[in-house]
Amino acid sequence: MSRLKNDTFLRALLRQPTEYTPVWLMRQAGRYLPEYCETRKRAGSFLNLCKSPALACEVTLQPLARYDLDAAILFSDILTVPDAMGLGLYFAEGEGPRFERPLRDEWEIRNLSVPDPHAELQYVMDAVSEIRRALDGSVPLIGFSGSPWTLACYMVEGGSSDDYRRIKTMAYSRPDLLHHILGVTADAVVQYLNAQIEAGAQAVMVFDSWGGVLAEAAYREFSLRYLQRVVDGLIREREGQRVPSIVFTKGGGIWLESIAAIGSDAVGLDWTMDIGRARALVGQRVALQGNLDPSILFAPPEAVAAEARRVLDAYGPHPGHVFNLGHGISQFTPPENVSVLVDTVHDHSRKLRAAVGG
């Protein structure tokens, strides 16, 4: 594989000095880009897009052609793993992802098994390999998965939920069943991410999108414990290079110190926590990724730039910061505002370093 021309993102994750703050965006290949919408139309469906290595590669590269981003992220979906477990993923118009066979009885749960990433999920590995070849060493490629808890939410609820009634009922009435789901799912996530690393992913991220809906004791028992299990099982080095890991719990700022202790290289922050305070708490242990409110991208360009500078100023000219949004970019984002954001992050972070001689 080609040597990286821009490894700023990887160095930042390892808290090494960088010339500027690297930036990429969660969901950077998505519906806010007209070229993505055109490719999605050609694919016929979102799942077809995910399951075609050539089309997944095409949309992964689209934001990199527009913006000076410092990393690419595999185009896929967090629900590929439970789909490979046989739950039957489909997308209902106006409802988002659904499962034909959600986990509702003990027999189904006890028979849950880890899918082979080189069988049911080989299309993902083929996409990773194809994207790495297409990037030709320009920037690193991030692989990803949902967290065990977040995947379990979809697997038990059958789709998105407002109150998580089914899975929370299980957590408090039959925790043994939920722990079984989480254990199998954690092992599946480890195998899935390691297969992505072997296929060419140079960093990996675990999205714990729904960890923040839990009470503290429940978060530690049903989410954090299994995030730890995933991190412990990851491949740490590949092709002679460290493969950094990022863990992101949306709504997890109140547990930041505990999350930082599980062994990942970086912790993602949503927009509700001051990143300067976060650095003061855990900056000696982990890099931090974040944490602009995605809604700021609806504002005029000068407001976008001002808020980006505010986040950078809060973190300061220290190593270990990867700039990102606090959650995925909205489909309604004006594409030109992303240009403003990326350019501001690069320019202002260089000025911050120059001011201290860094």
Swiss-Prot record:
GO terms for molecular function: uroporphyrinogen decarboxylase activity. Gene3D superfamilies: 3.20.20.210. Its main location: cytoplasm. Substrate binds at residues 27-31, 77, 154, 209, 327. Keywords: Cytoplasm, Decarboxylase, Lyase, Porphyrin biosynthesis. It catalyses: uroporphyrinogen III + 4 H(+) = coproporphyrinogen III + 4 CO2. Pathway: Porphyrin-containing compound metabolism; protoporphyrin-IX biosynthesis; coproporphyrinogen-III from 5-aminolevulinate: step 4/4. GO terms for cellular component: cytosol. GO terms for biological process: protoporphyrinogen IX biosynthetic process from glutamate. Its EC number is 4.1.1.37. The record marks 77 as: Transition state stabilizer. Belongs to the uroporphyrinogen decarboxylase family. NCBIfam families: hemE. Catalyzes the decarboxylation of four acetate groups of uroporphyrinogen-III to yield coproporphyrinogen-III. Homodimer. This is Uroporphyrinogen decarboxylase.
